[in-house]
UniProtKB/Swiss-Prot annotation:
GO terms for molecular function: alcohol binding; carbohydrate binding; CDP-diacylglycerol-inositol 3-phosphatidyltransferase activity; diacylglycerol binding; manganese ion binding. Catalyzes the biosynthesis of phosphatidylinositol (PtdIns) as well as PtdIns:inositol exchange reaction. May thus act to reduce an excessive cellular PtdIns content. The exchange activity is due to the reverse reaction of PtdIns synthase and is dependent on CMP, which is tightly bound to the enzyme. Inhibited by PtdIns (product inhibition), phosphatidylinositol phosphate, and nucleoside di- and tri-phosphates. Catalytic activity is higher with Mg(2+). Belongs to the CDP-alcohol phosphatidyltransferase class-I family. This is CDP-diacylglycerol--inositol 3-phosphatidyltransferase. GO terms for biological process: CDP-diacylglycerol metabolic process; phosphatidylinositol biosynthetic process. Detected in placenta (at protein level). Widely expressed. Higher expression in adult liver and skeletal muscle, slightly lower levels seen in pancreas, kidney, lung, placenta, brain, heart, leukocyte, colon, small intestine, ovary, testis, prostate, thymus and spleen. In fetus, expressed in kidney, liver, lung and brain. Residues 27, 95, 161-174 are lumenal. Its cofactor is Mn(2+); Mg(2+). A CDP-1,2-diacyl-sn-glycerol binds at residues 51, 55, 61.
């Protein structure tokens, strides 16, 4: 079999498209909320397709998994930076949210790699029950991730407009009410991510030290 070009696998090509759409979104964020949010959500929507393509074409790779996670983290972080500019009074909240998201996923990924997992989504079934559900139930994973991204996207749109009226309430405001609990739950799971990964790393350190004695 000739050498395969991992960088040109279909899921990775989708990943590159996600990055392009995200950059277009960031470019339009200061001036064109509907255009920016459309490209941002399109980038997020493609996240579901690259996973399906990887499984259907047997093209799952470590590079693809890393690309996927980094795109997710960087996209959310850039949106939160913009929100901090639009809502300066809530800057601390956005800073904490960014830090928690990046730190929890990075430490969880690193601990998974050190333990020998091929992906941060490969969960030891004897581990944390919340993370087990989060990573083994695709509906739960999709709902939490999509709801979290939609919350921040709606918060961005809400700065410019209430949105079309549904009765006497703007659509964007209504969407914020619905997605806020999901975003809060996602943040709590990030805390669990961080604590569980820290405990895993500490256990690995303890095991290594025991071997040296």
């Amino acid at each position: 079999m000739p050498d395969e070009n991992i960088f040109l696998f279909v899921p990775n090509l989708i990943g590159y498209a996600r990055i392009v759409f995200a950059i277009i979104s960031f470019y339009f964020m200061p001036c064109c909320p509907l255009t920016a949010s459309s490209f941002y959500l399109l980038s997020g929507l493609l996240d579901a397709f690259d996973g399906h393509a990887a499984r259907a074409l047997n093209q799952g790779t470590r590079f693809g998994a890393m690309l996927d996670m980094l795109t997710d983290r960087c996209s959310t972080m850039c949106l939160l930076v913009n929100l901090a500019l639009l809502y300066p009074g809530a800057t601390l909240f956005f800073q904490i949210s960014m830090s928690l998201d990046v730190a929890s996923h990075w430490l969880h990924l690193h601990s998974s790699v050190v333990r020998g997992s091929e992906s941060h989504k490969m969960i030891d079934l004897s581990g944390n029950p919340v993370l087990r559900i989060y990573y083994t139930s695709r509906p739960a994973l999709f709902t939490l991730c999509a709801g979290n991204e939609l919350f921040y996207c709606l918060l961005y749109l809400f700065h410019f407009s209430e949105g079309p009226l549904v009765g006497s309430v703007g659509l964007f405001r209504m969407g914020l009410w619905v997605t806020a609990p999901i975003a809060l739950l996602k943040s709590l799971i990030s805390v669990i991510h961080l604590i569980t990964a820290a405990r895993n790393m500490a256990a690995l350190d303890a095991a290594d030290r025991a071997k040296k004695k």
